[in-house]
Amino acid sequence: MAQKKGGGSTRNGRDSKPKMLGVKAFGGELITAGSIIVRQRGTKFHPGDNVGVGKDHTLYALVDGHVSFAVKGALSKHTVNVTAA
C-alpha cells in the first residue's frame, strides 16, 4: 500500500487572454485611413462605403473621414461607412 495519498490533479488553473474586441471608433468620430473601426468575430458589422475588411473580419477605414453606422435591408444588417472629410 502507498504510504502517502495520491498527489491529485486540478482541471482548472487556466484562462484565455482578453481578445479586445468591439467598436473602436464610434459614430461621428473623425478617423484617418487605416484606422480600425470594429474588431469582431464574424461579420456582426458589415463594411459600407470607404470601409475595408481584414482577414479576421476587422473593419478599417480606407479614407480619412467621419464614421457612421446604419441598419440596412430586410435582414437589418449593421453597416459601417466612412464619409470622406
Swiss-Prot record:
Similarity comment: family membership: Belongs to the bacterial ribosomal protein bL27 family.
Alphabetized Pfam families for the sequence: Ribosomal_L27 (PF01016)
GO-annotated biological processes: translation
Keywords: Ribonucleoprotein, Ribosomal protein
One annotated Gene Ontology cellular component of this protein: cytosolic large ribosomal subunit
PROSITE patterns: RIBOSOMAL_L27
NCBIfam families membership: L27
Listed GO MF terms: structural constituent of ribosome
Keyword hit for Ribosomal protein: yes
Name recorded for this polypeptide: Large ribosomal subunit protein bL27
Comp. bias intervals (Gly residues): 1-10
Annotated region (Disordered), positions in chain: 1-20
Entry annotated with the keyword Transmembrane: no
